[in-house]
């Protein structure tokens, strides 16, 4: 087993921890109206973990010309990254239209990126440019649109800011890694880029779901207020 496969295996195990964290979150929010929605957070580390197991065995990885397309990496991204930004919008109290809008922009960013990987010449860079435009639009949602919807609740504001900055800062790195790698300018090797992506994916998703667990009082507090009880007690 080569170094990349070992790293992929470790990453998959890390995502199993993320699934467990969501399980603890779900158990701690018994009776909350938001519990069923937040259960969908398990898809983020769950889909990512399954994808990395597939990547360990080379499933879905194909060579097109001189380019290696890791299919499950992009399948993971097209499913989980819209959920990452969608749940940020949910935390902000954004409208369904805004949430679906940011999720669609994210998915289109990933799909254009896949096209840029397999294309060549001018088309490659045109598709990279399209992906970059959608990428910039995500920052517009995170830093301009969603903040307008956040309720005047210090705990909700705190969680929203934490999620927004966590995702926003990490996602600056992804296009830079792509540019440096074999699909872009070729400054970095396939091995280096693969390991970097695995690190970024794990760092982006497992702490993300942990933040929901650590700040679960946001959702427990909402439950107490809706029931008319103004006494705020920590979630179990």
Curated annotation (Swiss-Prot):
PTM field: The covalent binding of retinal to the apoprotein, bacterioopsin, generates bacteriorhodopsin.
Induction and repression of expression: Expressed constitutively throughout the growth phases, both in presence and absence of white light.
Transmembrane segments: 6-26, 37-57, 74-94, 98-118, 126-146, 167-187, 192-212
Membrane topology: Multi-pass membrane protein
Location(s) in or outside the cell: Membrane
Family annotation (Gene3D superfamilies): Rhodopsin 7-helix transmembrane proteins
GO molecular function: monoatomic ion channel activity; photoreceptor activity
Main location group: membrane
GO biological process, alphabetically ordered: phototransduction
SMART domains: Bac_rhodopsin
Keyword GTP-binding: no
Positions of modified residues (N6-(retinylidene)lysine): 205
Domain of life: Archaea
Function in brief: Photoattractant rhodopsin.
Subunit organization: Interacts with Htr1.
Record protein name field: Sensory rhodopsin I
Species of the source: Haloarcula marismortui (strain ATCC 43049 / DSM 3752 / JCM 8966 / VKM B-1809) (Halobacterium marismortui)
């Amino acid at each position: 087993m080569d170094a990349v496969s070992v790293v992929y295996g470790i990453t998959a195990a890390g995502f199993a921890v993320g699934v467990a964290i969501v399980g603890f979150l779900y158990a701690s929010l018994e009776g909350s109206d938001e519990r069923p929605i937040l259960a969908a957070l398990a898809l983020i580390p769950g889909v990512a973990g399954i994808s990395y197991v597939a990547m360990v065995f080379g499933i879905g990885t194909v060579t097109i010309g001189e380019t290696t397309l890791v299919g499950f990496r992009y399948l993971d991204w097209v499913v989980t990254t819209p959920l990452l930004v969608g749940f940020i919008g949910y935390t902000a109290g954004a409208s369904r239209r805004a949430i679906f809008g940011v999720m669609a922009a994210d998915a289109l960013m990933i799909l254009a990126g896949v096209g840029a990987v397999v294309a060549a010449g001018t088309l490659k860079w045109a598709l990279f440019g399209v992906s970059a435009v959608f990428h910039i639009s995500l920052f517009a949602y995170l830093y301009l649109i969603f903040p307008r919807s956040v309720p005047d609740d210090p705990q909700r504001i705190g969680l929203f800011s934490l999620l927004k900055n966590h995702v926003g800062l990490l996602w600056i790195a992804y296009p830079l890694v792509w540019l440096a790698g074999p699909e872009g300018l070729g400054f970095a090797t396939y091995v280096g880029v693969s390991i970097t992506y695995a690190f970024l994916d794990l760092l982006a998703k497992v702490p993300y779901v942990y933040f929901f667990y650590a700040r679960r009082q946001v959702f427990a507090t909402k439950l107490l207020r809706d029931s008319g009880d103004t006494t705020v007690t920590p979630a179990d």
